[in-house]
Curated annotation (Swiss-Prot):
The keyword Ribonucleoprotein applies. GO terms for biological process: translation. One or more lysine residues are methylated. The keyword RNA-binding applies. GO terms for cellular component: cytosolic large ribosomal subunit. It comes from Acidiphilium cryptum (strain JF-5). Keywords: Methylation, Ribonucleoprotein, Ribosomal protein, RNA-binding, rRNA-binding. This is Large ribosomal subunit protein uL11.
Length: 144
């Protein structure tokens, strides 16, 4: 028989840097889950990723105080900022408020990486989504 699910916890944690301090500790402590076990498991699961990369994780809490978790690909904004070589997006988006640029080939590469977790039918659809995200961040999209 399947375990009874008591809740889901969605967090964004830097790869390889899960520790019991906020936001991880309080979120898991509310459900009575073993915080240190999660930290060890998460850090082991993200061992092959770049340290510090933000990783969305969905933790499923069960009635017997056990858990399972699923890691997802980092947010689009992380990849876009990395491709453009900037620390943060524009604070004033619109015409003339560009803070960097990305090429279509970079967007296609990001789309292929993110395709698993994007709501798109094909890579071209994912690229169009990324173009919109890039423009809203103040990045100009150039051919190349």
């Amino acid at each position: 028989m399947a375990k009874k699910v008591v809740g889901y916890i969605k967090l964004q944690i830097p790869a390889g840097k899960a520790n019991p301090s906020p936001p991880v500790g309080p979120a898991l402590g509310q459900r009575g889950l073993n915080i240190m076990q999660f930290c060890k498991d998460f850090n082991a699961a993200t061992q092959g990723m770049e340290v510090g990369m933000p990783v969305p994780v969905v933790i499923t809490a069960y009635a017997d105080r056990t858990f399972s978790f699923i890691t997802k690909t980092p947010p689009n904004t992380y990849f876009l900022k990395k491709a453009a070589g900037i620390q943060k997006g524009s604070t004033a988006t619109g015409k003339g408020a560009t803070v960097g640029k990305v090429t279509m080939s970079q967007l296609r590469e990001i789309a292929q990486t993110k395709m698993v977790h994007m709501n798109a039918n094909d890579v071209d659809g994912a690229v169009r989504m990324l173009v919109g995200s890039a423009r809203s961040m103040g990045l100009s999209v150039v051919e190349g």
